[in-house]
């Protein structure tokens, strides 16, 4: 049975769903899903779960993401990227890199962001991008996101505009195009996303990603080195080693007492942990629950069989 994660290097021009469809064809497996949509025009890391690893996607998506983006300052479009209709053009003053970096400060830390109309957010049973295609715009509530890093790499004039290359590390649910557009508005000139590369999604990094062509070549050679174990996408969750005599309990979904496992990380009620064998095999994800005797239980939440 094929099961695990694939760290795919998505090319520009394909949707995230296109990548999933390609992998279904290559691996001859239907149960495949991706760990967070990457815009069609963007490139970079797209984690994909195969087989029963799809049950872990909700935990994978909790990890932070990192991007390298290029913005054009002085240009505004209705989609906040170069695929949209131009709304405004405004010549830029002679910005310095110090000016531009200082203007990123209001957009670091915990901020509120309004999803763009071209997003996949649901509104009354429909996706926002479906409404946008019909020329409609609706009110969208702002969402809280966290920007850990908004760092200017380089900026240079380009005719009446400025181009800025930025490294961004952020929480899930952050819209990079909107972050850039809001930054441009703060600078008084507007901004549009010109290029986007996702360099990290959780523990999946660009340097380890596989192109679809590389995956196809490996399959032709009878290799599966691109297929990572289920635990590969869960590095942010604490690991607890289950003693051999309790492995069957966990595999059957039976809760075990925390004090039978050693060593134990610092845990709180409600935490999600990885239960593994001494050999590193992922048995289940478990939730920490209180015990009547003042200790705690590890209740299997997602069992891998």
Curated annotation (Swiss-Prot):
Q: What class of enzyme is it?
A: isomerase
Which keywords appear in this protein's UniProt record, sorted alphabetically?
A: Isomerase, tRNA processing
Q: List the disulfide bonds.
A: none
Q: What is its EC number?
A: 5.4.99.25
Q: Which BP terms does GO give this entry? A: mRNA pseudouridine synthesis; tRNA pseudouridine synthesis
Active-site feature positions: 39
Keyword Isomerase on entry: yes
Q: Which Gene3D superfamilies match?
A: Pseudouridine synthase, PUA domain
Q: Name one GO molecular function term.
A: RNA binding
What region holds the PUA domain? 237-305
Q: Catalytic activity, per the record?
A: uridine(55) in tRNA = pseudouridine(55) in tRNA
Ubl conjugation recorded as keyword: no
Q: Which NCBIfam families match?
A: TruB
Q: What does this protein do?
A: Responsible for synthesis of pseudouridine from uracil-55 in the psi GC loop of transfer RNAs.
Task: Family membership, please give it.
Answer: Belongs to the pseudouridine synthase TruB family. Type 1 subfamily.
Q: What is this protein called?
A: tRNA pseudouridine synthase B
């Amino acid at each position: 049975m094929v099961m695990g994660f694939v760290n795919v290097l998505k090319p520009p021009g394909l949707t995230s769903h296109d990548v999933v469809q390609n992998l279904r064809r290559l691996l001859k497996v239907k149960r495949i899903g991706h760990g967070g949509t990457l815009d069609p025009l963007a490139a970079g890391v797209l984690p994909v779960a195969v087989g029963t690893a799809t049950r872990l996607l909700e935990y994978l998506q909790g990890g932070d993401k990192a991007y390298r983006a290029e913005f054009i300052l002085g240009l505004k479009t209705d989609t906040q990227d170069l695929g949209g209709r131009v709304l405004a053009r405004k010549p830029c003053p002679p910005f310095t890199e110090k000016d531009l970096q200082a203007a990123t400060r209001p957009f670091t830390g915990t901020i509120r962001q309004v999803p763009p109309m071209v997003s996949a957010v649901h509104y009354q049973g429909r996706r926002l991008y479906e409404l946008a295609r019909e020329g409609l715009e609706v009110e969208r509530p702002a969402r809280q996101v966290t920007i850990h890093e908004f760092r200017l790499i380089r900026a240079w004039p380009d005719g009446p505009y400025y181009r800025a290359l930025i490294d961004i590390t952020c929480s899930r649910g952050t819209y990079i195009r909107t972050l850039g557009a809001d930054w441009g508005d703060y600078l008084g000139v507007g901004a549009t996303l010109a290029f986007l590369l996702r360099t990290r999604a959780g523990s999946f990094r660009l340097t380890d990603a596989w192109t679809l062509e590389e995956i196809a070549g490996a399959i032709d050679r009878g290799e599966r080195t691109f297929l990572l174990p289920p635990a590969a996408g869960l590095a942010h969750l604490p690991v607890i080693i289950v003693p051999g005599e309790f492995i069957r309990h966990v595999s059957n979904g039976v809760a075990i007492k925390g004090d039978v496992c050693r060593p134990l990380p610092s845990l709180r009620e409600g935490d999600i942990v990885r239960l593994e064998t001494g050999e590193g095999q992922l048995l289940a994800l478990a939730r920490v629950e209180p015990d009547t005797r003042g200790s705690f239980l590890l209740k299997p939440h997602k069992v891998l069989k």
